Regions:
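Hydrophobic alpha-helical bundle cores within soluble ligand-binding/oligomerization subdomains
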Residues: 1-440
Length: 440
């Protein structure tokens, strides 16, 4: 086995023993109550999952293994002459529950480089789709075509011992993450750049190489990709893409199938399209106002008109967070460093100063602050990356880091098949009348 794989197994064995002890000693303790409203309304607020890689703090935002976004920007290794964290370092942290050294992060880079070869049939499968196909559809089809390379599926078919599930899952996860930038970049160049492809550069890191293969060799764009891939990598386990990947994986579907399922969830408008909606809203505002540099007063009036029309301001509000999303702040700092005079970016900042007070004045909104989606699109547009449909693919490549690290832990800890109980409305009515005990 490899160095990282050996250390991961040792850590997982310790964690597994600890969890078994917790369940043995405290398994009957209740962790909360569930209301009928929660059951009917998306199970929001119900604690029903364990995800080791990240936890959402209402005040500090997402914490990866206990570290906030600002702490990660300070402590994670960076590319030579770079200022943003390497996603390889974040993956190591989520997998190993410890901060990596520069050497360890670079080792992940080299492992992914060695595993990055994509078989020709994957590209042929993508090429068989009409050019008009949505890039997320192409992406998921590409991942499904890559499933032929699954170590887990082959070993399971040959009678693999369940104690070895984690090993094959780890190999699949590393292969999948390594190959995603190649698949995504191929789709980008096929759909938007006349099918003129760029070969990978084996000297670049994972995110830098992704930028290169898409055709962006500006060093600051590579930095943006490193930041983007880091801050979008994980967001607890209850969101649609993470939960779906975990759920499908619990049936012992291999990591390729599980990840593809999760990304079909990410493609949904309520999950992965938010940054597109933000850019669309800003462009509509600029067009209606007849200026690409609206004043704060003009923005305030447009926001009021949006709200009066019964619409929401995209990019603002969060189900849990009660302050400005630190992922927004990280992107804002990137903008100040690399594009302080960009008109669209400055408009995003003016919206940031304008919207929260208006939302607060309504008195109905717990969180009037911007989330991660309020800023990311404007940074991409600065570099001429205006293929908005592809933004979700960027999100998908990033999210692989978190869901694959979690899937490795699921199999290493022997997580069982997920199978919650469901009820009918008729049985609920009988229960309310005291005629049925559906909760027993």
């Amino acid at each position: 086995m490899g160095i990282i794989k050996d250390r991961f197994k040792a850590k997982a064995d310790i964690a597994s023993a600890e969890i078994k002890s917790i369940i043995k000693d405290h398994g009957n303790k209740k962790v909360g109550e569930v209301t009928l409203a929660q059951i009917y309304q998306g199970m929001r607020g119900i604690t029903g999952l364990v995800t080791e890689t990240s936890l959402l703090d209402a005040q500090e935002g997402i914490r990866f293994r206990g570290y906030s976004i600002p702490e990660l920007q300070d402590k994670l290794p960076k590319a030579p002459n770079g200022g943003e964290p390497l996603p390889e370092g974040l993956f190591y942290l989520m997998l190993m529950n410890e901060l990596p050294t520069e050497e360890q992060a670079n080792h992940i880079t080299s492992v992914w480089q060695r595993r990055s070869h994509v078989p020709n049939h994957v590209f042929a499968t993508i090429d068989a789709l009409p050019l008009s196909t949505h890039p997320m559809t192409m992406f998921v089809v590409g991942v499904m075509a890559l499933q032929t390379e699954s170590n887990f599926a082959k070993q399971y078919a040959n009678g693999m011992n369940k104690k070895d599930y984690w090993d094959a899952t780890y190999d699949d996860a590393m292969d999948l993450i390594a190959r995603l930038p190649r698949i995504a970049a191929y789709i980008y160049r096929r759909k938007y750049r006349n099918n003129e492809h760029i070969q990978p550069n084996g000297l670049l890191d994972w995110a830098g190489n992704f930028a290169h293969m898409m055709g962006y060799d500006d060093e600051s764009f590579k930095e943006l990709m490193r930041l983007y891939m880091t801050i979008h990598a994980d967001h607890e386990g209850g969101n649609v893409s993470a939960h779906t990947t975990h759920l499908v994986g619990s049936a012992l579907s291999d990591p390729f199938l599980s990840y593809a399922a999760g990304m079909n969830g990410l493609a949904g408008p309520l999950h992965g399209l938010a940054n597109q909606e933000v850019i669309k809203w800003i462009f509509e505002m600029q067009e209606q106002l007849g200026t690409d540099s609206p004043t704060k007063e003009q923005i305030a009036q447009y926001v009021q008109d949006t709200l009066n029309a019964g619409k929401v301001v995209p990019g603002y509000g969060h189900a849990v967070l009660r302050k400005t999303d630190p992922r927004f702040s990280a992107q804002m700092e990137f903008g100040k460093k690399h594009m302080p005079d960009d008109k669209l970016v400055n408009t995003v900042w003016n919206i940031y100063e304008t919207v929260p007070p208006i939302l607060q004045s309504l008195g109905k909104i717990k969180n009037p602050w911007p989330n991660v989606d309020a800023h990311s699109g404007a940074l991409l547009v600065h570099y001429g990356f205006v293929e908005y449909e592809f933004y979700t693919v960027l999100f998908a490549v990033s999210r692989a880091l978190g869901v694959m690290a979690s899937l490795c832990w699921d199999r290493a800890l022997g997580s069982p098949l997920e199978r919650p109980k469901s009820v009918t409305t008729e049985s609920v009515k009988l229960w309310l009348e005291g005629k049925d005990q559906i909760w027993e």
